[in-house]
Amino acid sequence: MWFMYVLSWLSLFIQVAFITLAVAAGLYYLAELIEEYTVATSRIIKYMIWFSTAVLIGLYVFERFPTSMIGVGLFTNLVYFGLLQTFPFIMLTSPNFILSCGLVVVNHYLAFQFFAEEYYPFSEVLAYFTFCLWIIPFAFFVSLSAGENVLPSTMQPGDDVVSNYFTKGKRGKRLGILVVFSFIKEAILPSRQKIY
C-alpha cells in the first residue's frame, strides 16, 4: 500500500516537471513569435479585447451577471485599448499600465465575491476567468519583450542549436523576456563544452 503511494507522488513530481518545461518552452517560442510579428500580435490582442467585450456583454444579457462586475470588466477592456495605442512599447510606469494592473486586481476581487455567493460549475467559472480576466493580461505580459526599451537588454551570442532554430540563424540583440528565458535555460540546463 505505501509503495504505490510513494510511486504516485513520484509520478506526480515527474509530470509537474515535464508540464513546467513544456510551458516554459511554449512561452519562449511565443515570445519569439511576438518579437518577430508585432503588428500581427497587436491585431490579435485587439481581436481578443473585442471578444472579451462581447463575452462580458453576453454574460450581462443572458446570464444576468452583476452590473458592477460587467462595468469594471468593460472599463478594463477600454484601458487595454489604451495600452494598444503604444504597443509594442509598454511603459511600466504609464498611467494606463498601472491602472490596468489595479483593475485586474479589482476584477478578481469582484469575481471571487460573485462566485462565492452564486454557484456555477468549475468549468464555467474557469471559462469566465480565462476569457474575461486572464487571456488579455497574459498576452500583454508575453509581449513585453517585443519593445526594445521595456526590459533591460543585453547582447547574447545564441550559438546553441535551440537559439539558432528559433532565430533562424540571425545573430544580434536578444531583448526583453527572452533574455530572462535564456538565462533560466542556461542556469537549469547549462551547455556542455568539451575541454581538450
Swiss-Prot record:
Keyword field: Membrane, Transmembrane, Transmembrane helix
Q: Which residues form a coiled coil?
A: none
Annotated compartments: Membrane
Which parts pass through the membrane? Answer: 3-23, 42-62, 70-90, 97-117, 125-145
Its BP terms in the Gene Ontology are: endoplasmic reticulum to Golgi vesicle-mediated transport; positive regulation of apoptotic process
Q: What coarse category fits the chief subcellular location reported for this protein? A: membrane
Q: How does it sit in the membrane?
A: Multi-pass membrane protein
What terms describe the molecular function in GO for this protein? COPII receptor activity
Q: State the superkingdom.
A: Eukaryota
Expressed, tissue-wise, as follows: Detected in testis.
Write out the GO cellular component annotations: cytoplasm; membrane
**PANTHER family per the record?**
PROTEIN TEX261, TEX261 PROTEIN
**Which family does this protein fall into?**
Belongs to the SVP26 family.
Protein known as: Protein TEX261
Origin species, per record, is Mus musculus
